[in-house]
Amino acid sequence: MMTKKALGLMIGALLSGALIGGEAAAGQTLADFHSKMGGCASCHGTNAVTAASVPDDERALNAQCQTCHGSYKDIRKTGTEIDPHHSHLGDINCTSCHTAHARPKLVCNDCHTFPNKMPFADAPEATPKAAPDEAAIEAAMKAEPRESYDVVVIGAGSAGFNAAIAARRAGASVLLLEKHSFSGGNSMLAAGGYNAVGTKQQKAKGINDTVEAYVEDTLKGGRGKNDRALVEILAKESAAGVEWLEGMGADLSEVKRSGGARVDRTHRPTGGETVGPHIIKTLRAQAEKDGVPARLNSRAVRLLVDENHTVRGVVVEGRHSGLYRVNAKAVVLAAGGYGQNKEMVAFYRPTFKGMTSSNNVTSTGDGVRMALEAGASMTDIDWIQAHPTVGKGSRILISETVRGVGAVMVNETGARFVNELTTRDRASDAILKQPGRHAWLVFDADLYAKAKMVRGYDHLGMLKKADTIEGLAEAAGMDPKVLEKTLTDYNAYRAKGHDDAFGRPDMPLAVAKAPFYAVEVAPGIHHTMGGVAVTTESEVLDIQSRPMPGLYAAGEVTGGVHGFNRLGGNAVADTVVFGRRAGEHAAKYALEQK
């Protein structure tokens, strides 16, 4: 009997063409290939297959893939070559990339530009699926519900996962919807950390921090435009949120400082692991354990609202199942912001029209649109934050942690021009005033060893590298004498403990140990500050500022928490603190209904 490993090796050889005399036939799809090895049953099992019979989340299909090919751990490469089977996205569905009946798509290339060496890359492209028309949505709204739950959560990023887990633990039946082929949302790309005050980590390091200081820093960063009541909850419950995640197995043991904070309060995994993927991996696993896995490929398209303005459920569009109605006693909107919706960005913030975005492709404003259609009120909806350090010419966010750990920011001549740890809006404004509207982050071997994400940027070919400052300046097109003086002055400021030039409050590392590195950056859309207006209990407000019964919201889809400008580390805290609150209050409301 052939073992699974042997069968996987054989199929791998077939896919490479080694056993069939060359490349796959032109236009052949993955499904065509598998049909020669057992027909539809080789992927779908023995049941009759129709488009509607394939589960939208495709979990069974992916289990079948692993039966033959093994798990990601079995097939990923261990060398330095970029391997999509070993990425920050985690162990996502095989079908996220390997579409069976059309040309495969490397989802990494939503952000990157890796060469596509996937099997069947010359298969016909899939026909884009048309958006459901109004008549079809209306028909689904009037149809009998396919399912009913106490709570439906829309969006499986950090806010959505936290809401779903909290609601389930409160005793509610829960459905977690995710429109993409894998979960994580914008949270998957979070690279800085989680701001929290009063944690055991701060106490162990002797960091003197207070709730009042956290609130003041956040209000100052937001230029006083924040909803103070929401900020106070964020600060007061931030430490409990860290403990909540740690109880699921998360590591947030390292504490650093982000821009706009007076002390170290940004918690992240030890060893420089990126915080977003780490938290999402933790939440995915916990949701599975708690019985609320994300239903993937399932887009919420319309909230169901009765004549009393009470939310009663949602219309869902499944990849395979089409439109259907789900009844719910409460709905939590956790669908993220609109940073990838160019039309919405141009409408709400015309000056940002055409600007690149660091956001996940899922950040298209679905939650804002559905809330508006349902009669919800918005707050600060036209406020958008540009992150100062997006990789120039890319969509890759260069984490604030790089500056926090010690990188120096210079312009194209090699001169410093700003306090690297100022707030994001001020840093972005300063960069846009420089020649070429771009800048460079410069650092040395010590920072390269300390901040793990920097090695990821190197892996992607984003870094300039040299054994001398002069060589680095030449590689980056700077004036060697200017850069040499800039770093000499900076190291002297660090040695005496005061930045005479720009007042940088924290200078953890010198830039003195070869090799030296630089990465080119420019501002890009990073966070939509405004959104759905909510109460302190995460209830969505209508246009008369009254809570809409049965509708809750958390995360970037909401407004009010961050004001005009968000501090680095506050978004992750926001998703955890208010995701939990939304789930708990939605469950409480739902369980009180008849």
Label each residue range with its predicted role:
Residues 370-377, 484, 575-594:
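Internal hydrophobic alpha-helix adjacent to the cofactor/substrate pocket in enzyme cavities
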Residues 302, 482-565:
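A glycine-rich dinucleotide-binding beta-alpha-beta segment and adjacent secondary-structure elements
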Residues 140, 173, 179-293, 297-302, ...:
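Conserved N-terminal/central alpha/beta ligand/cofactor-binding core
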